[in-house]
């Protein structure tokens, strides 16, 4: 009960801080972001040391390789996160944007204007860099944020949030707008605070995200899986296809936008697979193929139905030979997770059909699935990826942390004037 009460107080404090941030100028918020960046740079040795401790403990506990890769934060990864933080300051302020400005009648003016959501709860496995990304977006969008990292990242998150709050202490943004929880019990209680928390963003494994979705009444923004596909069409440029496949699978295999299944048209299967296989083998990628693939690459393990529905997050790639574009589309729409899928082809009509018929949040032509990322989209950073059909969808940056309200300003106007036998008509003129 003590934990529940204290967490409610934390949520209330976060909301109070967020209410003040909601009215800050763009300049004040950008100054706060720069102060945080400088504080993180100053705290780099402490952050790296804390992360090394987390990594040693995680190795002792036998953490899975994909989680370990997400947990590890060297100086280059930290500097990249700080760069992303600063990029958020250069983005357009999403708050106070007038989406509708309309005269309903003389002296009766309607506006629809963007505003912060309020308090966001973010729960994540490993991924200490998520602390920096999400804090930056929360500051810029005038929201408060309650962060809960996995136990494997506890020391890293503590140092990161300490530095962030230290940076904010010299600015107009109240440090109480960024809070950190550290126990599993607090996670469960956070999911129950629908009265105080406006949005939950989970970042982690399939089972983790599903657990969050099934245990809260708070709206959830997230995706459970990242089963991404690359389809090499019969009209593909083979060299492009090899280069893109290597990048999509190996550039960062633990990422949710890494390719997990490779589909190859039967007309180019022998040529393409014979060229891409040595490159994948050189990078220690394990292939699991259907029988048609095994006839071309005899050393490849046999794929099962489970492979087509698996997010490996590792150097494993399932391969299937298909007889048509329609077959590739059907496979992706059946087994895919709605994250990101790509077609490699020089046939514009085939690309057009693929882009239209694949139902994923990201559908690409002649480029790697790894481009499905908020930073690469120019969002500055992302709070997560959403594969749901309703917006926000795909990599979610500032726009996913903003809602809107309707404001009407009148001068003694009453609704009765516009109803009944002698009702006055509305003018409905947009400014």
UniProtKB/Swiss-Prot annotation:
Transmembrane segments: none annotated. It catalyses: L-glutamate 5-semialdehyde + phosphate + NADP(+) = L-glutamyl 5-phosphate + NADPH + H(+). Keywords: Amino-acid biosynthesis, Cytoplasm, NADP, Oxidoreductase, Proline biosynthesis. GO terms for cellular component: cytoplasm. Gene3D superfamilies: Aldehyde Dehydrogenase, Chain A, domain 1, Aldehyde Dehydrogenase, Chain A, domain 2. One of its GO terms (molecular function) is glutamate-5-semialdehyde dehydrogenase activity. It is found in: Cytoplasm. Pathway: Amino-acid biosynthesis; L-proline biosynthesis; L-glutamate 5-semialdehyde from L-glutamate: step 2/2. It is an enzyme of class 1 (oxidoreductase). GO terms for biological process: L-proline biosynthetic process. Its EC number is 1.2.1.41. InterPro entries: Ald_DH/histidinol_DH, Ald_DH_C, Ald_DH_N, Aldehyde_DH_dom, G-glutamylP_reductase_CS, Glu-5-SA_DH, GPR_dom. Signal peptide: none annotated. Belongs to the gamma-glutamyl phosphate reductase family. Catalyzes the NADPH-dependent reduction of L-glutamate 5-phosphate into L-glutamate 5-semialdehyde and phosphate. The product spontaneously undergoes cyclization to form 1-pyrroline-5-carboxylate. NCBIfam families: PRK00197.1, proA. This is Gamma-glutamyl phosphate reductase. It comes from Trichodesmium erythraeum (strain IMS101).
